[in-house]
Regions:
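Residues within well-ordered alpha helices
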Residues: 21, 46-47, 85, 107, ...
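Short, acidic loop-to-helix structural element flanking the phosphoryl-transfer center
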Residues: 66-95, 101-105
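N-terminal helical cap/lid subdomain that shapes the substrate entry/recognition surface
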Residues: 1-77
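Anion (oxyanion) recognition and catalysis
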Residues: 23, 87, 153-156
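Short beta->alpha linker loops
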Residues: 13, 74-78, 99-100, 125, ...
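Small/polar loops that bind or transfer phosphate-bearing groups
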Residues: 10, 95-96
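Asp-based, Mg2+/Mn2+-dependent phosphohydrolase catalytic module
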Residues: 101, 105-159
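Short glycine/proline-centered loop/turn elements that form peptide/ligand docking sites
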Residues: 53-55, 80-85, 145-148
Length: 159
């Protein structure tokens, strides 16, 4: 179980994208003045509630990600190589993300790992994602590259 915020931090990009959505779509439907919750899953729910069927905030967020992700997130060679080795050896790779799914899909394609990931789960934590799938023996990679490399039996090489 791979936890997105540690392997590919996108919190700043998400915040920028939400600000863009508010500016652009707020002209079509008044955007609430109350700040969004800090928890991303709760923020996504609040955005869904605000948008209803009046505006497509998810589509606009996806477009923002597609345009801006190359500047904000760089693919990591060590992460990609390790995920390829794990995938080739038959390890089931589950990517857990705070969402939304549209942003996660763009991220995985940008990182070049979309085909290596067996399943994507939107959840508030890696352990929550594992529980939702009924994975009691899942190895959780929640603390970044070193933990991923340890899972693959490798050591980090300083660059």
């Amino acid at each position: 179980m791979l936890w997105e915020p540690e392997l590919a931090p996108t919190e700043a990009l998400f915040q920028e994208a939400v600000e863009h959505v508010a500016r652009k779509l707020g002209r079509a439907k008044e955007y609430p003045t109350a700040p969004l919750p800090d928890d991303r899953a709760a923020a996504v729910l609040a955005l869904d509630t605000w948008a209803g069927s009046d505006v497509d905030w998810r589509g606009e967020l996806r477009r923002y990600y597609e345009e801006h992700i190359p500047v904000r997130v760089r693919p990591g060679a060590a992460v990609n190589a390790t995920l390829r080795r794990l995938h080739t050896s038959g390890v089931r790779l589950v990517w857990a993300s705070p969402g939304p799914a549209e942003a996660t899909e763009v991220l995985l394609h940008h990182l070049g790992v979309a085909r290596l990931i067996d399943e994507v789960v939107i959840a508030t934590s890696a352990s929550g994602a594992a529980s939702s799938l009924g994975l009691t023996d899942a190895v959780l990679v929640e603390n970044g590259l070193d933990e991923l490399l340890a899972l693959a039996g490798e050591a980090a090489v300083p660059t």
